[in-house]
Amino acid sequence: MRKIGFLLFLNLCFLVPLVASAQGPAPKVPVSGHVIDASSEEVLPFVNVTLLSVKDSTLIDGTVTDEKGNFTIKGVKANGSFIMRLSFIGYKDVYKDIKLKGKPLNVGTLAMNTNAEVLSGVEIVAERQMMEYKLDKRVINVEKNLVSAGGDASDVLENVPSVSVDEDGAVSLRGNSNVKVLIDGKPSELLGNDLATVLSQIPASTIANIEVITNPSAKYDPEGMSGIINIKLKEKGNKGLSGNINLTGGSAIEKFFPRTNGSAGISYSTKKWGFSASVDGRFNERGRRSDNMKLLFNQARDGYDAWMRSQQTGNSTNLSGGGKIGFDWYINDKTSLTLSYNGRVHGHPTDGAIIANENLLDQRFGTDTSLYSARSLDQITTGNSNGNFNTFSLNFTKQFDNPEQELMIDANWNIGKHYRESSQILDYWNPTMPNYEKRDVSESDNKRAVVNINYSHPFSKTLKMEVGYNLNYSNRYSIYDYYLNGSDVRNDDMSYEFYNTEYINAVYATVGYSYGKLSGQLGLRGEITNLNGRKEMLFKENDSINKQYISPFPTVHLSYQITDMQSAQLSYSRRINRPNMWTMMPNVDLSNPEHIRFGNPNIDPEYTDAVELGYSIILPKTTIFTSAYYRQTNNRISWFNFLWTEENARKYGFDWVLDIAGDEVDKGKLAQTSLNIEKSVNYGLELIIDQQITKWWKVNISANLFGNYTDATIINNKEIKSFNWDAKLNSTMNLPGEWTIQTSAMYFAASKTIQGERAARFFSDIAIKKNINKKITLSLRYADIFRTAGHNSTTITDDYISFRRGRPYRQSLTLNFSYRFGDGKPMKKAPKKHLDNGAGGEAGGGESEE
């Protein structure tokens, strides 16, 4: 299949001129058929199918096969003899004599054999496209993205059009951070509770492609307001023995922070059995630094304004490793059973320092250090965390006589443990202020089950139904212990135990149909969510919360094939963002002497209605994809920061917090919680262009122009409107001698937030690759060429203004070595082995690409 994919682009380039020059009589009857690879029996999309004159071999008409290998030529006179030619770069041409007798003709299934001479003697420059456009998603082929070589999953996502990753590892899609991330079609939570940590543990070398699904069908988990990002890992490929080894070493340039990782995989397959195993490990250090300035108005300091500056430095180490092993049993040509295990361990030591200096603006204290503000201090933090996650999976796939009729069962069980310890020392400049030391220790046990059952049934060639069930269960038990001022005795006023259970049961049905050039899918998903949480503390009343949501999620997908090279899509879906237990728990966290954090038990889920209109066209050297989208979110959940005063607590409806933290009012502390605002609207236009400038030079340009409207009257009596944009450029040059040079540039324009704004960002990378004997690849990557990466933001409230400037040590140099071995032949296609569901599937009743 990989060889097939490599050759798609050049075939498209050659076909369009042929079809454009076709001349012949008016259409009379259609000629149709199906094309496959002779050895693997994989379908062959985008094969050139042409009809030639028997007399002089002139071109009569032509088309290309679709993604399922099917084709139909409509412009053929009803009677006569013709020669049908199938052509596809890397394959031997196939010729077939056909004779029409006034009726439509189906030539059946035609098989094409690879041409070893062609593959060895011709340099395939374009190979597989970096980005492929399918019915309801975009697929980014990671192996074509050199500037992420040697990095991790976050580096890969940074280079995906319309996707961004901030300095804390938060992922956004089209400017919205509420996105669902899947790993091999399964929730990323199966590998860890923190997404940023999970992404940092996945080497880029283990990723096959990234699927971006902006408006998923009812088959998918509706979590993720802006859509779904599915990270698909590499799997075994050929029959026989094959494998690969990847090694990476490098460092940040400004300061030595080593960045190393390695991975290895091996697979062996026969007609009846398959085995695969892989391991990977990482040792990375990252530095961080930020400068924060805050102006507190006179409400905060006895009638005096105050100016505070804090400078933060630190570094963290990511030491992680994992392994995966899988066994396949091909019971027969239509049935398979797969068992697999995926385990990961990680360690994450951190340390940092903060220097915070607060001055009263009237300088009434002069040089008397005894009168320094209580907020001027030196802060030292250290920490360490480690954990393990183990996932056991079973997949059963059964195809019937009609390959479109299929039953799939996918079950996953995950158990994990996590330990975290951190300490914080506050050394106040004011000698009359006692120093403060806090150490907290947390341990958690996690259990999670994900079960997906899907059955697809074709009623005819144009009508197909899919039904399914999805269970998502999680259970977590955590202990949080706090120790103050060097004491080894636990502080029972702050320590607690936390129990959390979540059940999500879902059923769904989709009906896909096609009529001529029009195809579509209607879907409906119903979910019942039950959340239960309980916090227990000694000598205090327990806090608990129980929530249930029953929600319908309709979806509509329409596609119209304007011509063989042009298509349009229209889709609608309803999405949900469920507040997590920490967001809702009526818990007040007083462990930080500078901040107060508490949950909001009155928070409700937010729902989004999303509409999208897309258009794509394939030209000889250009592919253009554009999409206009509109999303309206009701009951939007937003983080909210304010100065902790009694007046503000009552103003925003948090009177109950005063019973717990009433003694902390009017001390200049900041409070943070979440709440529902009325609504927000996000709309935009996305444009992606793949341009083959020359035979050896290709450019991908993407831009996203989007506007935001937020009704934030409940927070600051304002309606916030903004228009933002971002753009990415990727240039790939395939040079003689198996050399490749790739550069990328990314720009994110300034944008407004509910309580402030984020500054513009820009950075650029470059990479050079050398292929040796088609088995060894060397890649050198230089990240952040101009040292411009950074994150600057401003927060504005009625009580203070803060400015934050963060600069990561992103500029780095890394060298990657990759070795592939094995002489296996392509395998015969087996039934699919996983559900793209957190679960999920494709619109229009289509199947996922393996």
Description of each model-found segment:
Residues G322-H346, S376-E536, Q561, M565, ...:
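Face-selective signature of the C-terminal outer-membrane beta-barrel domain
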Residues K417, N530-N532, D564-A610, Y630-V665, ...:
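Surface-exposed extracellular loop regions of Gram-negative outer-membrane beta-barrel proteins
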Residues I36-S39, N48-L52, R85-Y91, K101-L146, ...:
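Short, acidic, small-residue-rich periplasmic hinge/interaction motif at the N-terminus
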Residues N106-A111, A153-V156, L195-V198, V212, ...:
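N-terminal periplasmic accessory domains that precede
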Residues P222-I229, G237-D291, T317-G321:
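Outer-membrane beta-barrel translocator/receptor signature
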Residues R439-D440, R448-N452, D492-Y496, T501, ...:
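Outer membrane beta-barrel strand-and-loop segments of large Gram-negative receptors
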